[in-house]
Amino acid sequence: NEARTNYEEKHNKATFVKNIISDNILPGDVYVRAKELHFVTDVPRSVYLVRQLDRSDVAALEVIQNLFPDRQRDFVLSVSETDIVVIKELTREERPEDIVAVAENIENAVRSELLVKTVIGIGTTAYHLRELADRYKEAQVAIEVGKVFDTEKSIINYENLGIGRIIYQLPTTLCEMFLSEVFKKNPIEALDPDTLETINKFFENNLNVSETSRKLYVHRNTLVYRLEKIKKITGLDLREFDHAIVFKVAMMVKKYAGSLTHISLRCTGTARCSEEIQHP
């Protein structure tokens, strides 16, 4: 009987948590239900969204569950064919790098045991049960923003999205307006792939002409000539910090605007809600 009671309580807790992150329970009811289930409401918890890429394996749920043996405090929930949510209770001593290490363990386990590639979004820490839904949405946003700006990363932390998070919330019309203002002389498409590669390397090397020319295996004067050419085409001198910032942001906005034809934007809690954006 005791084993059955524990199983039922665990099952009910998992269902309760799933209802919270899915917004299927009223905020006022969270307190009542938590009390009924003897659920501690105000401990810190991290929220991970594990998305299987290329192919999904139903065994992924069990593989991840095995990493979290404390079934009363940690919850591993299947929310779709490809998505699994992990909600882990934290101690006060855990640092940001410890939270990322958990995601790395999940990624490694799924890859080594099932040969399945994943991308993992991490929301900010929830300090109360009622915050779980927002933290789950943050993990979703982390993955969506990562798909645009951090394609090489498999673990994306919402806290580290930086300017990408701001750009992600811009409406299409504002993106287009900004790009037309920045590139008054010529559109960004006027820059060929080699020129764009030069620009990216210049940014990677902190606008250092000597270091960039070394990385590109070109003479310093050749790089200066290219930068002058960019200035002539765009009106922006990338050697000037303010111009470089404007250009960098414009490149990110352009990348984001291009992605709007095929990505689904989800609610961020404060941003706009779920809508599939299609451009003609």
Give, region by region, the residue ranges found by the protein language model.
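Short, charged amphipathic alpha-helical surface segments
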Residues: 1-19
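Cytosolic nucleotide-utilizing catalytic cores of signal-transduction proteins
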Residues: 13, 24-47, 51-280
